[in-house]
């Protein structure tokens, strides 16, 4: 917007050190009336150029190293959520969020690390057994983690990603705001029924041979679930139930899981999780995203509640 020299000097005063009520007096000394002050502020607000400095003050409670580490994330949030005070509020909300990741393979451990790196304060990883060499990935477990308990190795990976996050014990207290189901292999939709019955939002992520999938994001009772997706896949591919059984059989041999595809799935799943935690709807809500290792394509596929599932039936419906 075009401004006169006096108005330009007034804009210089909007540096976060003055309360809103003090601005008319400051503007009067520059020869600018209160009506024009209101017009300027409305124009700035309309183009998302104003922020609320008071909303940033709670961030001062974070360790200086953590504030510096999260500065790029805060800057990105200010572009995605440009309202006054919206970005710091979203970052602080992430700090209080609880996420449980089920699975510490190439996808799951990386999802947990990325969420912690993005400011999620309470990230817990659940998996059984010990780390195998093929579980290692740049964003998750390390090659020298082989032989360690998966939960211990995943906890260390999360701590490396965010050294100044809250104590891990806080992650185990209370129900999670989101569960990410990312086992080593294909997620079994039947295991997700307990999450549906408990009313816990959850997001599926995994790799099957040369295809990675993110979704659906399940909001129990209001969006299609993993069983809906399994029914849909079985309709499209009659061999799907057999493939699912093979991947969920606990076989000892490593399954196909390209490192770059796993990293892409993990980063996409983490992004979808953050979009949900930040209060918006990611593409995996009411659908899922397939990612091809063969040609690098990403395709969102819509998903409706399946009539053979019943997860979205209303009480009393027949």
Cite the ranges covered by each PLM segment:
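Adenine nucleotide-associated cytosolic modules
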Residues: 1-318
